From Swiss-Prot:
Belongs to the casein kinase 2 subunit beta family. GO terms for cellular component: cytoplasm; nucleus; protein kinase CK2 complex; UTP-C complex. PANTHER family: CASEIN KINASE II SUBUNIT BETA (PTHR11740:SF0). Tetramer composed of two alpha chains, one beta chain and one beta' chain. Keywords: Phosphoprotein. GO terms for biological process: regulation of transcription by RNA polymerase I; regulation of transcription by RNA polymerase III; signal transduction. Regulatory subunit of casein kinase II/CK2. As part of the kinase complex regulates the basal catalytic activity of the alpha subunit a constitutively active serine/threonine-protein kinase that phosphorylates a large number of substrates containing acidic residues C-terminal to the phosphorylated serine or threonine. Phosphorylated by alpha subunit. The lineage of its organism: Eukaryota, Fungi, Dikarya, Ascomycota, Taphrinomycotina. This is Casein kinase II subunit beta-2. Transmembrane segments: none annotated.
Length: 254
């Protein structure tokens, strides 16, 4: 089987990694598999360049088959991939398989497991540590004052969209600036994660800690450009917040 046909899923993705270059960037250095190294597959995967967004999923989470419900239908060579992730596979037992294919399936499977893991209490805590350290980067918008961002997906299905970065200050999505992250699938983080994260860790929400919700106001010779103008500002309400939502809710209840 050729490298360009490595990823073959049961659904019909709109975005696939169909070229050799794309496959090489996403699944780099397959030949350096941990099968012959004194390191777990999970640690090896997360330590590779470009995998900084990922956390190490606990093996007991993966061994609980309830957490893997339905993934056998989404990943080819599911059993072999799962054995590889859990280091239950010896090199000589895979002689009849194309190791590139098994490695690719294992990485897809791990990504989908990762999506489910990071919305658990333990997974959220691990991601919170990375977020606090700024591992995921900062918002490129000037008025967001270097607010830390979180990885997010637009879909929970593999192959739909690459990973994006969600800014909790301007509530917008941005593509990663580094090319090493452009082929990470968005489903490996999912659409739920960033919003559940800030519900679980409200103290990390920048809207509650730093006053950086500025909105750019276009001006000509010092005068504000009207919103009715063709070149005027658009949809500024998207970045406007209530000063004290708590007091508003109390007044409504009265």
């Amino acid at each position: 089987m050729s490298r360009k046909n490595l990823i073959k899923l049961n659904h019909d993705p709109t975005v696939t990694y169909s070229t050799k270059d794309d496959a090489d960037e996403l699944f780099d250095d397959l030949s350096s598999s941990p099968l012959h190294e004194n390191v777990s597959w999970i640690s090896w995967f997360c330590s590779r360049p470009g995998r900084e967004y990922f956390v190490e999923v606990k093996e007991d989470f993966i061994e609980d088959l309830f957490n893997l419900t339905g993934l056998n239908l989404a990943v080819p060579f599911y059993n072999e991939a799962l054995d590889l992730i859990l280091d239950r596979t010896a090199p000589d037992t895979l002689e009849n398989f194309d190791m590139d294919v098994i490695e690719t399936s294992a990485q897809i499977l791990y990504g989908l497991i990762h999506q489910r893991y990071i919305i658990t209490r333990t997974g959220l805590h691990q991601m919170a540590e990375k977020y606090s350290m700024g591992i995921f980067g900062c918002c490129p918008r000037v008025n967001c004052c270097y607010t830390h961002v979180l990885p997010a997906g637009l879909s929970d299905i593999v192959g739909k969209m690459p990973v994006m970065l969600f800014c909790p200050n301007c509530l917008d999505l941005y593509a990663p600036s580094s090319s090493r992250y452009k082929n990470i699938d968005g489903s490996f983080f999912g659409a739920t994660f960033p919003h559940l994260f800030f519900e679980s860790y409200p103290e990390l929400n920048p809207k509650r800690s730093i006053p950086c919700g500025k909105i750019y106001q276009p001006r000509i010779y010092g005068f504000k450009v009207s919103e009715l103008s063709k070149t005027g500002p658009r949809m500024q309400w998207l970045r406007m917040y209530l000063e004290d939502s708590g007091s508003d809710s109390e007044s409504e209840s009265d």
